Amino acid sequence: MILLVFEGKKREPELFAAIERLGLFKPGRIICSFCSDIQSLHKRVKELEGGVEGAADMVQLLQVARRNDPDDLIHTMTSDDISEIYLFFDSDLHNSRYRLAEQVERLDELLSLLGNEQEYGKLYISYPMIEAICHTKELPDAKFEGYCSLIRDGKKFKDKASKFSPYNSLDFLIPQDERKRDEVRSNWSHLVRQHRAKAQRLCEVSAKDHLTQKKLFQAQCDKHITPNGEVAILASIPLFLYDYFKEEKRKELGFSLEE
C-alpha cells in the first residue's frame, strides 16, 4: 500500500483523484492529510525521534497528528501495511514564527531524513506553495523557467497565481467533462515536463539524471533564497510524477524529456 501524506485536506487530494481518473497514477493508496505546515512536521519528527535521528515512525507520527479524528484511515494502519510513503508540503518560507535561516535549516534537516519512500518517507516540496501548479500561462509555457516569487509575498501568491493563469481555477487539471479528458491529460503532460525541465536546469543536471529534492532545495538556496529572497516557482506533484515512473512509462504518458 502506498501512503500519500498531504499538507492540506482539499486541493492536493482532489488533484491526485484527478490524476488517477486520467490513468496517470495507479490506484491502491491511502491518503492522510497532515493539516498543518512543514514547520509543524519538523517539530513532530523531532519530538518522536527523542534525540535519535531516524527513530520516529511516520505512521505513528500521523496517528498522533490525527488523534482528534478517530475515523481517519491512518488509525487502521501499521508501518508493515505501507510499502512506500510520499509527503507533499509547501516550503512556506514566509512563516513569521521563525527567522528565514531557521526555516531553511529545518527544511534541510527534513529533506536529509525524508529522502527514501521505502524507509521513513520521501518529501516533495512546492515553492512557494501548492498553488505553484496553477502559475502558468497557456500550456506549454515557454517562459515558465523564469518565473520566481518573492518570499515576503507569502500567502499573496495564491491570488497572484490565480490571476496569472488563463485557466479557470483547477479546471484545466481536473476533468469536469469527459469530453475534455484528453485535453486535461495533455495539460498534465505539459506541466510535468515544464516543471522537471525547470528543476533540472536549476540543478544543472540532465533528464536522465536522478534529481533529489535535497539537491533541488540546495539549488533554490544558492540561486534564489539566499541571494534574492525569492524562490523559483515549482510544484511538488509534477516533479513526483516524473520521478515515480521509469523512462519507458514516461514516454507512454507523455512525460519524457529524453530525446
Language model segments and positions:
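Extreme N-terminal starter segment of soluble prokaryotic enzymes
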Residues: 1-3
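Short acidic, Gly/Ser-rich segments with clustered Asp/Glu that frequently serve as metal-coordination loops
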Residues: 8-13
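C-terminal accessory helical subdomains adjacent to catalytic cores in phosphodiester-
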Residues: 14-38, 42-59, 63-259
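Short beta-strand/turn micro-motifs composed of small residues
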Residues: 6-7, 89
